[in-house]
A protein has these predicted regions:
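Sec-exported extracytoplasmic/periplasmic mature domains
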Residues: 31-35, 58-62, 89, 93-96, ...
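Hydrophobic packing residues within well-ordered alpha-helices of enzyme cores
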Residues: 54-57, 131-132, 186
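A conserved hydrophobic position in a structured secondary element of the catalytic/binding core
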Residues: 13, 123, 178
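Extracytoplasmic/periplasmic substrate-binding proteins
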Residues: 96-163, 199-206
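Mature extracytoplasmic/periplasmic domains
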Residues: 151-152, 156-212
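Extracytoplasmic ligand-binding site segments that recognize negatively charged/polar headgroups
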Residues: 1-108
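Short secondary-structure boundary segments
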Residues: 43-44, 125-126, 190
Length: 213
């Protein structure tokens, strides 16, 4: 058994007071990196956020449709993503430390942005930027953005083990996690993307979500 309890989405962010431009695709990102040479980077793979960013670069350049039914052949996949890999190689010289090394993880990159070493960052928490502005971690002029074609996202699931000793109780807990009330509270305190269908909520329930700033 499994059920969704939250969603996540890759976002990028910059400070509009320092960099008024907001790259909307890989081509604009390259020009952005050239203009702010040494001030752009991403977490080293296999960091979760860094990996998502690289996958997003791949999808933005070569699309994702061709991979749906592609045979599990490493060479075929490598050939398909080569244009994106070539782009990353072209991008490298303009990155922090000329792309020779990368921040070891997302929090390191985030601190570099806060300290002014970088003019751009990225996060897998869609509302994390807003939360960081609210608590003073980020400047009030920091803004989040996505590419025009969108960014990678996923749904998080909670599951019941096949050998669970109390399936009924686990279902009750899951139902509670999926309830509009708990989803709204998670949205408010954890800034996670809710899994509820907004169109099916009552007016009172909708107001609970609408009132979250």
């Amino acid at each position: 058994y499994e059920a969704p309890y939250g969603k996540a989405q890759l976002v990028m962010y910059n400070d509009s007071a320092i960099t008024p431009e907001t790259p909307k695709n890989t081509e604009e990102l390259l020009e952005f990196a050239k203009k702010y040479k040494g001030k752009v980077t991403y977490p080293a793979l296999p960091d979760f956020t860094g990996s998502a960013f690289v996958r997003n670069i791949i999808y933005d350049i070569v699309g994702h449709e061709q991979f749906a039914n592609m045979p599990e052949d490493k060479e075929k996949v490598k050939e398909a993503i080569e244009p994106a890999l070539e782009y990353l190689r072209e991008l490298n010289p303009y990155l922090w430390n000329e792309g020779k090394t990368f921040p070891d993880k997302e929090p390191t990159m985030k601190n570099m942005y806060i300290d002014g070493e970088l003019v751009m960052g990225m996060s897998y928490a869609a509302f994390g930027v807003a939360a960081n502005i609210e608590d003073g971690t980020f400047s009030e002029t920091t803004r989040s953005f996505q590419f025009d074609k969108g960014t990678i996202g996923n749904t998080n699931y909670i599951a019941i083990a096949g050998n669970s000793g109390n399936v009924a109780a686990a279902k009750v807990a899951i139902n509670e996690m999926m309830s509009p009330e708990v989803q709204a509270e998670r949205y408010k305190t954890l800034r996670t993307i809710p899994v509820v269908d907004y169109s099916k909520l009552s007016d009172e329930q909708k107001k609970t979500f609408d009132d979250v700033n």
